[in-house]
A protein has these predicted regions:
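Active-site-adjacent loop and "lid" segments of alpha/beta metabolic enzymes
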Residues: 1-15, 19-23, 29, 34-94, ...
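Flexible, glycine/charged-enriched surface loops at secondary-structure junctions
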Residues: 97-102
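Conserved Motif II region of HX4D acyltransferases
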Residues: 108
Length: 154
């Protein structure tokens, strides 16, 4: 398996698996992955939170409105920062209740958000400090960047 090869060749490398399937998380952590990054924060697999707790690895919980198939179908928010904070209030509580001790939150730039939503969130990143956990902000190769600069993603 590629994960074992990477860990053998580069033992100090910290690997993350991007998945919303608990079985994938379990198998890849067993192979040497160090962290689970779930775009649904456990919403797409009822076993994810308990699995990550059992695995005892850091968990990146991302906010996404909708699913990967529907997230860009007219995303709507009344107050995006408040709604994402409210989501993480519930989600971090669920993670802690499941036994996850190392939580990282990701506001989910580009996942169920318009360019305007992304900029509103970016301007209010300090609101996430109330959780006292690391915040991951994935901005690379997002349409927010290339559309604002009037260039192509290439």
């Amino acid at each position: 398996m590629i994960i074992k090869s990477i860990k053998e060749s580069y033992p100090s490398v910290f690997l993350s698996i991007d998945t919303y399937h608990a079985t994938v998380a379990s198998k890849t952590v067993a192979a040497g992955v160090d962290m689970v990054n779930d775009i649904s924060a456990g919403d797409m697999d009822a076993n994810m939170l308990s699995t990550v707790a059992t695995l005892n690895v850091p968990f990146i919980a991302m906010h996404m409105q909708g699913t990967p198939d529907t997230m860009q179908d007219k995303p709507t928010y009344n107050n995006i920062a408040k709604e994402v904070v409210d989501y993480f209030i519930q989600k971090t509580a669920a993670c802690k209740a499941a036994g996850i001790t190392d939580i990282i939150i990701d506001p989910g730039f580009g996942f169920g958000k318009t360019i305007n939503h992304n900029f509103q969130l970016l301007k209010q990143m300090e609101v996430f400090q109330l959780f006292q956990v690391p915040v991951l902000a994935g901005l690379s190769r997002k349409s927010t960047v290339w559309k604002t600069l009037h260039i192509t993603p290439e």
